[in-house]
């Protein structure tokens, strides 16, 4: 991994069965991490899927007849975890079968969540790493 400076580390794990969430943020002086990201096919260009957007930031669906809010499932502020416009994300569903670990297709159907997601902001050369265990 390219060399970055850790600028934030929050971890609430330690609850029942290790439940909790964590956020670690690294700042890079250049785009050396981007070069590594571009060689890994499991990193996807933003925007994220609707499911991942809901998990991290929450979404509101207004059909005209009803309003449904989903998420977020993390307790980080907009300052700690900003919405990134230009960048890449890497998702691992740690509860899924190994062949489905990079898919979020079934994640909203579960009573508990165990996932990791990395977000890289190309505008600020900042990497955000989030883990959620419920």
Residue ranges and their predicted role:
Residues 132-134:
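Short, solvent-exposed aromatic-acidic interface loops
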Residues 1-50:
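N-terminal export/targeting and maturation segments
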Residues 43-128:
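Functional cores of ribonucleases/endoribonucleases
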């Amino acid at each position: 991994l390219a060399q970055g400076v850790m600028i934030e580390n929050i971890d609430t794990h330690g609850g029942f069965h290790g439940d909790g969430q964590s956020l670690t943020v690294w700042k890079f002086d250049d785009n050396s991490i981007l070069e590594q990201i571009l060689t890994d096919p499991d990193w996807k260009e933003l925007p994220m899927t609707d499911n991942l957007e809901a998990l991290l930031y929450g979404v509101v669906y207004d059909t005209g007849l009803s309003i449904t809010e989903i998420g977020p499932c993390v307790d980080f502020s907009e300052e700690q975890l900003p919405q990134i416009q230009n960048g890449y994300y890497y998702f691992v569903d740690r509860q899924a079968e190994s062949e489905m670990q990079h898919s979020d297709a079934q994640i909203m159907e579960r009573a508990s969540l165990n996932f990791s997601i990395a977000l890289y902001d190309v505008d600020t050369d900042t990497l955000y790493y989030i883990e959620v265990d419920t």
